[in-house]
Amino acid sequence: EPTAADIAKANDADMLVVNGGGYDAWIYQAVSDQDNIISALPLTDHGKLDEDPDVMTIDAAKATAKDDPDKVTNIEGNEHIWYDPAALEEVAGSIADQINEEYSDAGATTEKIDSHVDQLRDKLKELPDDLNYAQTEPIADYLMKYTDGKDVTPEGYRKATISEGEPATADVAAFIKAIDDGEVDLLIFNPQTETDTASRIKSAAEDNDVDIVEIGETPPDGKKFWEYYDEVTSKLGKH
């Protein structure tokens, strides 16, 4: 929960950049001037993002990314929006616009970020079209929407993890069976929220020589955002 000092700092800020989607509602709901807020996802109460009228499935997001790669998509209420290259472009553009509005001679641009994001997308497009991947939690949805690979994570398991719930025993068993049966080419694993269930799935992947790419919610200590982003997309692009 925010302290009174946290709320005071937020209200004093000329610009507040937030995740949105309920992830950091504690801070943006406390700000009196909502016009100072720049968000990657719609501002909403926690757990209400899936009620966004623009919410879509991962398959729909993949189709959208082909037609309009710059469009930010809300994939089933998934809050890991900073892995969406389109969101990076949009937020950067909003920041530049606000800076230029406040300081007419600032000349803020997004050229470097736009170029960097295009390179990230190109790396992701290198993934094979027939790649079957699964995730211990849907951390890479916004990256994988730029690929033709198929998310074969069992539906029940995916629904539970995207809503931050605990998967049912049957869904975990289905996940491990899919790995044992050779239906998973790549496992995406979040080491920062490793649970007993996720560890079992990772062990099954290791036992079956399934490639594993680790993607955390935030960069490891000592690593900058873009550095980690490049590392993650490079690892994915090798498969």
Task: State where each predicted segment sits.
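Extracytoplasmic metal-acquisition and chelation regions
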Residues: 1-239
